[in-house]
Swiss-Prot record:
Organism: Buchnera aphidicola subsp. Baizongia pistaciae (strain Bp)
UniProt key word Transcription: yes
Compartments it resides in: Cytoplasm
Upper classification of the organism: Bacteria, Pseudomonadati, Pseudomonadota, Gammaproteobacteria, Enterobacterales
Similarity comment: family membership: Belongs to the sigma-70 factor family. RpoH subfamily.
Gene name for this UniProt entry: rpoH
Region (Sigma-70 factor domain-4): 230-283
Protein name: RNA polymerase sigma factor RpoH
Length: 287
């Protein structure tokens, strides 16, 4: 198995987290063709430069995932670091022949590492520091397993039952259920190689379909770049016609007659120019 060193990644620390995030976001996302090419170089030839590019181009996704676990009292830098470990494991195991984007494959490994980290550290997180908070913590867990998120009426009942303020119940609920967590014991014999055979009961986050969102965003960015390049290949008049007819954000889209008046040509000629321009754009975008 190919080993990807952690020194491949930019260093993270609490003091330079913002600069790390800026650096991670500065790496361009890969098109599906670029990703496939690099993945094949790594998978078939062990190209570590390809591995490095794949990792660096996906650091932003680890940051995105880690933000959904900020409700546990753990440092984001640590969550990101754990997620990066998952990313590296995913990259060195990714088979480009399986027919999915790397982010779809990697998101499970990223979450798995973050979940393990939360599970290891949850017991030392000081969620409840005062007497009333401790009372809430140990009583709310059982109540929430039965009710889930409290509505106003349930909130009032719980506060009365435990003899605390409504605000205290809501605050503890937020601390405990920021991600609707359910913590489970990980078997002592759990090993890294079992990550796919043993399904970790994921801590529910607000982005369970994260990979789909990322792929959609990635595809949208790719299409936008394609469209921009395609438009630049048109002559100025054709480009202006397309913009006025299809890309203008205002409520009023210009008619063929209005454009014809501006250029001193017939509306039929504008229609022909528009049709030809659309054909050129289609060819440029699809190639």
């Amino acid at each position: 198995m190919i080993k990807v060193e952690t020194k491949t990644l930019p260093a993270i620390s609490l003091g330079n987290l913002d600069s790390y995030i800026r650096e991670a976001n500065s790496w361009p996302m890969l098109s599906s063709q670029e990703e496939k090419y690099l993945s094949e170089k790594l998978f078939y030839h062990g190209d570590l430069n390809a591995a490095k590019t794949l990792i660096l181009s996906h650091l932003r996704f680890v940051i995105h995932v880690s933000r959904n676990y900020s409700g546990y009292g753990l440092l984001q830098a640590d969550l990101i670091q754990e997620g990066n470990i998952g990313l590296m494991k995913a990259v060195r195991r990714f088979n480009p022949k399986i027919g999915v984007r790397l982010v779809s494959f990697a998101v499970h490994w990223i979450k798995s590492e973050i979940h393990e980290y939360v599970l290891r550290n949850w017991r030392i997180v000081k969620v409840a520091t005062t007497k009333s908070q401790r009372k809430l913590f140990f009583n709310l867990r059982k109540t929430k397993q039965r009710l889930g998120w409290f509505n106003d009426h349930e909130l009032e009942l719980v506060a009365q039952e435990l003899g605390v303020k409504r605000e205290d119940v809501r605050e503890m609920e937020s601390r405990m259920s920021a991600q609707d967590i359910a913590l489970h014991h990980v078997p002592d014999n759990f090993r890294e190689e079992q990550n796919f055979s043993y399904t970790i009961p994921y801590l529910k986050d607000s982005l369970s379909d994260f990979a789909n969102h990322v792929e959609e965003d990635n595809w949208e960015a790719h299409k936008t770049n394609k469209l921009s390049n395609a438009l630049s290949s048109l002559d100025e008049r054709s480009r202006n016609i397309i913009h006025a007819r299809w890309l203008d954000d205002s409520d009023h889209k210009m008619t063929l007659r209005e454009i014809a008046h501006n250029y001193g040509i017939s509306a039929e000629r504008v229609r022909q120019l528009e049709k030809n321009a659309m054909k050129k754009l289609k060819v440029a975008i699809e190639t």
